[in-house]
Regions:
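Conserved alpha/beta enzyme-core scaffold
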Residues: 2-520
Length: 520
């Protein structure tokens, strides 16, 4: 079976395969153009007659559980990433698969991190055929150099849920690391020595997988309250000595930036939102965990405090600064998909106004609405943007695949999307004629904030009108690009072969772009 076949040009002008790892794929048609048909996928029917009447599903060890689950060649094995770089379970699963001589597995993580670098040896020896999920760091380099046997597929968090729900991906065995569980399999992420916050990224896995194994290091008597994963979905429970390192769930800097340029980006972004009337009593916002985004949140807090306003809700990932806004009464609710530090974990556990969400509620595009389009202001990053406001978040200027999509694509449906980004990194301009990899169509990106000026998407005539009298340096994106090239020169394009090594899916499951092998 070839990795891919039947290349076509999609609605974004990108050449993409329509056969991927032996399965038919649909090319991107435009925003909201592809409408799904049919019904949701479903797991196998089960019978209580096959489970212990006392509810005790505990199995002696992870190897025994995988064997009992029927692990075999060619299966799809899923894991979640709520422990981020502190995950101790994912690699163990494939250590066991290798020991058992299993080959051709598809790994379906909700994300990968540097702690998963050991997976490269299993990609090399055929234990893992390919990854459908983020391919960060060493895994991204391995993929970019054309070494992965199958074709990689990158999806957003919402796109992952959509793919499972729609039957595009069938999970054979889901391994769900849970900081606290009872013997029945009810589990949560807010209690126990490895508490990580929510477990929402594992929701689709629990709901749709043929076999679900919960792995915990904190087994409590029934019932485990609150439960984020319902034990009625769970086949087996395994107890290990340690499943995660909570200190390593920390994402980004989790500290406000001290860089003068980044502070300027934050200040201008907040000032833009204020002058454009985007901040009001009862508004909502979402920002990331990087230093610039955290600083923007602090500027928002100052504005709210001064005017005695409140944000109705903020979308997480949560962090100590967002938690402080909640506790101060500047934010009424945090709707949180993942916690970026231990203050977020504590708050989710103790504060009923800090509630966990999942990709189903927040991001699933094949549903009856989701939360993402209700957010007033969305602050995001990007590795590149182009003169048409298209953006890239997965590859760098050298063409290497180094990041996952996360919830980035899904949040583009917010009412105003702002990208505060440096005009250049390591003397390489960030604004290009065309992004290396298309991850977000420009029609959904409204404002680019750089340390040399702010560009408003011409589609947003309302924002252009509101900012006519602003003292902020409002410029065109072409002017910003020209200034970057005057300082740094015109950047060279990365050198690629014609071979496709991975694809980027859009939120509706269509193929948005191809990632090609880097010529070393």
């Amino acid at each position: 079976m070839s990795k891919y076949d039947k290349l076509v040009t999609n609605a974004a002008g990108r050449i993409v395969p329509t056969v991927i790892n032996g399965r038919t794929a649909i090319p991107y048609m435009g925003i909201g153009k592809y409408k799904p048909d049919g019904r949701r996928a479903a797991p196998r029917l089960a019978s209580c007659a096959d489970f212990p009447p006392d509810g005790n599903k505990v199995t002696a060890g992870l190897k025994e559980a995988l064997v009992k689950a029927g692990i075999r060649d060619g299966m799809t094995i899923s894991t979640h990433h709520h422990f981020r770089n502190g995950d101790l379970v994912g690699t163990q699963v494939f250590d066991i698969a290798h020991e058992l001589g299993i080959k051709g597995l598809m790994w379906f993580p909700s994300a990968s991190f540097p702690c998963h670098e050991p997976m490269t040896k299993y990609l090399e020896d055929g234990t893992i055929d390919h990854i459908e999920g983020s391919m960060n760091g060493a895994l991204g380099k391995f993929t970019s150099e054309g070494k992965m046997k199958g074709l990689g597929i990158l999806r957003s968090h919402g796109g992952r849920y959509q793919a499972v729900q729609d039957g595009e991906v069938h999970i054979d065995i889901a391994v769900i690391a849970a900081p606290s569980s009872d013997p029945f399999g009810n589990c949560n992420g807010v209690n126990g020595p490895a508490a990580c916050g929510p477990l929402g990224f594992a929701l689709a896995d629990a709901q749709y997988a043929d076999h679900v194994i919960v792995v915990t290091d904190n087994l409590v008597p029934f019932p485990c309250i609150p439960w984020q994963i319902n034990g009625n979905h769970v086949d087996q429970v395994v107890v290990l000595d340690q499943i995660g390192i909570p200190e390593k769930i920390v994402s980004g800097t989790t500290e406000v930036t001290k860089s003068p340029d980044r502070l300027l980006l934050a200040e201008w972004s907040a000032q833009f939102c204020d002058e454009a009337g985007l901040i009001y009593d009862g508004f909502s916002f979402q920002a990331g965990a990087g230093g610039t985004s955290l600083s923007i949140g602090i500027f928002f807090a100052d504005i709210l405090r001064e005017r005695r306003w409140k944000a109705r809700f903020a979308r997480g990932g949560s962090n100590k600064y967002l938690v402080k806004m909640l506790e101060e009464g500047l934010v009424e609710y945090i709707l949180d998909g993942q916690t970026f530090d231990l203050d977020g974990v504590r708050s989710m556990r103790d504060n009923p106004r800090h509630t966990w969400t999942s990709p189903f509620t927040s991001y699933n595009y094949h549903g009856k609405g989701n939360f993402s389009s209700m957010v007033d202001i969305v602050i995001l990053g990007a590795t590149e943007v182009d003169v048409n406001f298209n953006a890239n978040v997965v590859t760098h200027s050298d063409g290497y695949l180094l990041h996952g999509i996360g919830g980035w694509q899904n949040t583009l449906f917010g009412k105003t999307v702002i990208l505060p980004i440096p005009l250049f990194r390591d003397r390489i301009p960030v604004i290009r004629d065309e992004v290396t990899t298309l991850c977000g169509p420009g029609e959904l990106i409204d404002v680019i904030v750089t340390e040399r000026g702010i560009a408003i998407n011409p589609r947003r005539t309302d924002l252009i009108e509101k900012m006519k009298k602003s003292n902020l340096p409002i410029r065109t994106i072409d002017e910003l690009k020209a200034e970057a090239e005057k300082i740094c020169g015109v950047p060279e394009k990365p050198k690629f072969s014609d071979e496709v090594v991975a694809v980027v899916k859009w939120v509706d499951g269509t193929v948005l772009d191809s990632i090609r092998r880097v010529i070393v």
